[in-house]
């Protein structure tokens, strides 16, 4: 019995120390300037860690028009295909797009980090390190010419991965040969 109490106490402490808190969808809405700053700071922090170091990467900034476009994409709940180019062309500029889907609500930092972690399968100057791996999210996050972005989140209750995070980046990246 003493071991059970000790185990439960340790489990409670570990959950608290790992920052396990209940998230609410409203806590992650990108209309909140604090969330916008979290997203921008996470992107800029990760972009600074690119290896080899990039000399000409532009700093990301938030753009409300792009965020509205990302919101339209998130509201579609179409997790199988990206927004058509015509739906993510803003001011004549084609924007790139990343999706993150999850059955559990995750923070923006978690989703952005998951995109960035595709770097493990990418080699600069070569591309994907093996067939079938995803690296396009990573390359869009670090694309040197992208400097404006906006993101949105939506609950898609009829999807198995019901939480849908979308970021759009302008100008878009992933241009073959660059």
Curated annotation (Swiss-Prot):
UniProt GO molecular function: calcium channel regulator activity; potassium channel regulator activity; toxin activity
PROSITE patterns given in the database record: CRISP_1, CRISP_2
GO cellular component, one term: extracellular region
Domain called SCP: residue spans: 41-169
Tissue: Expressed by the venom gland.
Signal peptide positions on this chain: 1-22
Disulfide feature: 77-156, 95-170, 151-167
SMART domains the UniProt entry points to: SCP
Pfam families: CAP
Keyword tags: Calcium channel impairing toxin, Disulfide bond, Ion channel impairing toxin, Neurotoxin, Potassium channel impairing toxin, Secreted, Signal, Toxin
Location within or outside the cell: Secreted
Record PTM: Contains 8 disulfide bonds.
Annotated TM spans: none
Family of this protein: Belongs to the CRISP family.
Function field: Blocks ryanodine receptors, and potassium channels.
Matches recorded under PANTHER family: CYSTEINE-RICH SECRETORY PROTEIN-RELATED
UniProt name for this protein: Cysteine-rich venom protein VAR3
Species per Swiss-Prot/TrEMBL record: Varanus acanthurus
Top-level taxonomy: Eukaryota, Metazoa, Chordata, Craniata, Vertebrata
């Amino acid at each position: 019995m003493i071991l059970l109490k000790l185990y439960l106490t340790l489990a409670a402490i570990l959950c608290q120390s790992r920052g396990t808190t209940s998230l609410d969808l409203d806590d992650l809405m990108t209309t909140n300037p604090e969330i916008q700053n979290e997203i921008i700071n996470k992107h800029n922090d990760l972009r600074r860690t690119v290896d080899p170091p990039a000399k000409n990467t532009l700093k990301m900034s938030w753009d409300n028009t792009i965020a509205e476009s990302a919101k339209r994409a998130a509201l579609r709940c179409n997790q199988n295909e990206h927004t058509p180019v015509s739906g993510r062309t803003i001011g004549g500029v084609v924007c790139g797009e990343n999706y993150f889907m999850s059955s559990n609500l995750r923070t923006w930092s978690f989703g952005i980090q998951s995109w960035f972690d595709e770097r493990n399968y990418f080699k600069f100057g070569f591309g994907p390190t093996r067939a079938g791996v995803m690296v396009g999210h990573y390359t869009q996050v670090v694309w040197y010419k992208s400097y404006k972005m906006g993101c949105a989140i939506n609950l898609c209750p009829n999807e198995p991965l019901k939480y849908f995070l979308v970021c759009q980046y302008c100008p878009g990246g992933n241009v073959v040969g660059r």
